[in-house]
A protein has these predicted regions:
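ATP-binding glycine-rich loop module of kinase domains
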Residues: 11-50
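Catalytic-loop of the protein kinase fold
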Residues: 114-132
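Conserved short submotifs of the Hanks-type protein kinase catalytic core
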Residues: 70-84, 88
Length: 305
């Protein structure tokens, strides 16, 4: 390791582990005060994290440092606040429109990776690895089993992935490629809407055909690129080019804060409440007076004075 690299790493002091994972820390830059995430990953991922550092996108945490040390790779990346989709889905399903929008943004996140030379395949797209930030931005937060496509290779050298999201080729039938990630996007789309995997229950309606095409056993029968999947979702569902998903705690918060009280009682401000009481009393008395007057007119043909 170069002396300059060692100096840059020493700028970051470790504060605590993240989620009890021994290889991920929250760190702080001693000079700037910047809070960041430090990961210790396989050195085999150096080319991938170097690409992420050199080609930043809004859909992936910024990589500040990517330094090899003692046969390991030290990555310093952007610290994000928010919830991953798995956490969100513990309390609520995601509406069809929101789920489609999230997948569209994931397609945009994967596009530069799949178009890289050689192509980068995530291989572990799942709810726990997708974060919705407090700003409602979609981020892929884990590339620890990503790989680069190797021309002429019949299958992956290491079989890796998450069971429910893994495409058939991840079990050794053939080499993984961009269509492997498309398979996982189909699983994720179904899971967000139903909180069930396609093997348990398939989504109904207009997205069913899209999910089924993503999940074809033969990669040649799936959408061939994320561009194709994005276009289908856009044309079939919504034009969401400039929108951000609203998925997250907002749903529960909006429902909790929504008040069904009469006007004047919703703000819980004392003078507004008092004014409302006096107003409603006046209106009630006026209505009662008019009712008596109307009744007397019907009985006598003339109004009481």
């Amino acid at each position: 390791m170069k002396l300059s690299d060692e100096y840059r790493l020493e700028e970051y002091e470790e504060l605590k582990h993240i989620h009890d994972r021994s290889n991920i820390f929250i760190v702080r830059n001693k000079i700037t005060g910047l809070i960041a995430v430090k990961k210790i990953v396989s050195v085999e991922l150096k080319n991938i994290y170097t690409f992420l550092k050199e080609h930043p996108t809004p859909f992936i945490p910024k990589v500040f440092e990517c330094i090899e040390k003692e046969n390991q790779l030290i990555v310093i990346e952007e610290y994000l606040t928010g919830q991953n989709l798995e956490e969100i889905l513990q309390g609520q399903s995601i509406p069809e429109r929101e789920a489609a929008l999230i997948v569209i943004q994931l397609c945009r996140a994967l596009k530069p990776l799949h178009h890289a030379e050689p192509a980068i395949i995530c291989r572990d797209l799942k709810a726990a690895n997708v974060m919705i930030t407090l700003e409602k931005e979609v981020k892929i937060i884990d590339f620890d089993i990503a790989r680069t496509y190797q021309t002429g290779q019949s299958c992956d050298t290491k079989l890796m992935g998450t069971k429910e999201y893994a495409a058939p080729e991840q079990y050794g039938f053939r080499q993984t490629d961009a269509r492997t990630d498309i398979y996982a996007l189909g699983v994720l789309l179904n899971y967000m809407i139903l909180r069930k995997f396609p093997t348990e229950e398939l989504v109904s309606g207009r997205l069913r055909q899209i999910v089924c095409k993503c999940l074809e056993m033969n990669p040649d029968d799936r959408y061939q690129t994320v561009d194709e999947l994005e276009n289908v979702l856009n044309s079939l569902c919504y034009d969401v080019k400039k929108e951000k998903p609203k998925t997250g705690n907002y749903t529960k918060r909006d429902r909790r804060n929504k008040s069904y009280a009469l006007p004047g009682f919703r703000s819980h401000t004392w003078w507004k409440t008092l004014s409302a009481i006096l107003g409603y009393v006046f209106v009630t008395m006026l209505a009662f007076s008019l009712e008596l007057t109307t009744g007397d007119t019907k009985l006598t043909g003339m109004r009481l004075r």
